[in-house]
C-alpha cells in the first residue's frame, strides 16, 4: 500500500479501513472475498453498512484449490453461511471458486463488481514473504474501489506490534 499507510495500519489501536479509490459513485455490487477470521468479519460488517446505505448486493466469495478435500470444502461453505448471517438482510449470494492462485482469482472476480472489501491478512511475516500478502495484491490489482478492513484485536494486536518492532 505504502510505507506511511502500512505504519499507520500496523500501529493503530483502533479498527482501520484503507481505501484505494477506483470508480466513482455508489456501488451496485460488492465483492466480499473471505477466508474467515476477525478481519474478515469486520469486512463483512463494513460491506453490510455500505450495502444498506446504497442498496448494493454483496457476493461473498471463498477460494479453494483444486486439491481441497471435501471436508475443507464443507468448512468453506459453513464459513460463507456465517458471513451471510453477518450481512443480515442485505441482498447477497455466495460463490466457492476453485483456483491455484487466490489473489488472482479475487482480482479476476473484482472486474464484475464496483467495490471489493477484503479483511487484512492474519498471516505471519514468514508466510507473507513466501506466499505474498493477498489483501495487498488485491488492493494493487483489483478493478474498481478496494477497501481493506483491519479490526483492532486489543491485547493481541498490541503484543504483535511490540514484537514486530524488535
Language model regions located:
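Intrinsically disordered or low-complexity boundary/linker segments at protein termini
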Residues: 1-48, 52-68, 114, 141-166
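Active-site phosphate/pyrophosphate- and oxyanion-stabilizing loops and adjacent acidic/basic residues
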Residues: 6, 48, 81, 104, ...
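Short low-complexity, flexible loop/linker segments enriched in glycine and/or proline
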Residues: 31-33, 75-76, 109, 133, ...
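Short, surface-exposed alpha-helical segments at coil->helix boundaries
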Residues: 44, 70-81
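Short helix-loop-beta junction
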Residues: 50-54, 81-91
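Short, small-residue-enriched loops and turns at beta-alpha junctions
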Residues: 65-72, 124-126
